[in-house]
Amino acid sequence: MARVGPEAWLLRLDAWLAPFLAALPRVEQRRWAPLYVQGLLLPGERKSVEPMAARVAPGQVQQLHHFVSTSTWPHERLEPVLGGQADRLVGGPDAVLVVDDTALVRQGRHSVGVQRQHCGQLGKQANCQALVSLPLARGEVPVPVALRLFLPERWAQDSGRRGRAGVPPEVTFRPKWQLALDEIARLRAQGVRFGCVLGDAEYGKVAAFRHALDEAGLPWALGLPPNQKVFPPDVTVAMPEPTRRGGRPRKHPVPSVPSVAVSFLFADPPDAALRTLSWRRGTNGPRRPEVAKVPPAATGGKPPEGAFAARRVRVADGPEAAGAQHLPGEERWLVCEHRTTGARKFHLSSHPAEASLEQLAAAIKARWSCEQAHQQLKEELGLDHYEGSSLDER
């Protein structure tokens, strides 16, 4: 591929930015936006305002800082432009919308939403801001289309912190899965096309999230915690007989068999009788799944690169029954992924009953594109260098 010179690169950037600039209401915003984006794209150790200004607008740090932190960006006008551009690039029935979290580590306590909470970047509790992220992806190309700040419940109820960070009264605590549903609805209303919603167990464990996707007619493949209870697909439900002759009728129906945790449904290490798939990772990400040539049991129980097995189940997410237990819900695919590290991951999918194991594994592993997007946003575009501390600074 021929190298693109600086003049051609800037012309391409100008063409890409043109519809976004048209959505900005102020002349000074239209002037500073291209310089800010150039600062993010150009090489540099830090992507905060001062070092970027030194590279793209020497001597004009205050002007660039005003654009980033004081000048209000009309996101409601910019988001449809981003959605349209993303759909043109990667949208379609074979695209996926990935729901995930990413965290920005922070030192102080005054930035909006900062609290000691789980930080995936560090793999532990840390002082950070949490963002709900939704990249649209097809193949190996992810395009971030939504990034929403999560306000922890305790933080959202602290009037002092809210006031200092400029959080308006109408912005209240919403769980991450509800923020994700808000963004999914917005993207669909803007005409962004995708065929499946993907997410990890933090979203997959929420029955209300799965049910909302069902009601919206959206197929999904989501992670699942190992203690999630499920029933076999042929389970039946009936009202039990009274405990004694002439006794009161029972209030709740009872399933024909008890539910079990998903971790008990697959052999560990993998059973040679189970059909497995290997996942071959290329330099640009996961490739398509292939039928494993050697069963895991023949290699000491270690699957080659990652092995998959699936079975039909009914999740215990139906109406509530006695003892705070839940009755069987809809029939779904339960997928067990055996990783080379020895870890097992469980996934639930609404794919149709005739879906192949290759199709299920391909959907699950498409979440890799979200990890790639987060890595690029932080390492190449300086997402974790952003210095805004209030909700108005966006």
Regions found by a protein language model. Give the residues of each.
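Generic structural signal of hydrophobic/aromatic residues within well-ordered alpha-helices
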Residues: W9, L13-F20, A33-V37, L64, ...
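Short intrinsically disordered, low-complexity coil segments enriched in acidic
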Residues: M1-A2, V313
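Conserved, well-structured functional cores that handle cations and Mg-NTP chemistry
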Residues: A2-L198, E202-K229, T236, R244-V257
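Short amphipathic alpha-helical "interface-anchor" segments enriched in bulky aromatics
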Residues: V99, A103, Y203, H252-V254, ...
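Generic secondary-structure boundary/loop-capping signal
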Residues: L64-H65, S111, Q115, C119, ...
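Short, contiguous acidic/charged loop-to-helix segments that flank catalytic cores in large enzymes
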Residues: S389-R394
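An anionic, glycine-rich sequence signature occurring as long contiguous blocks
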Residues: G123, A137-P169, G223-P226, V230-A366
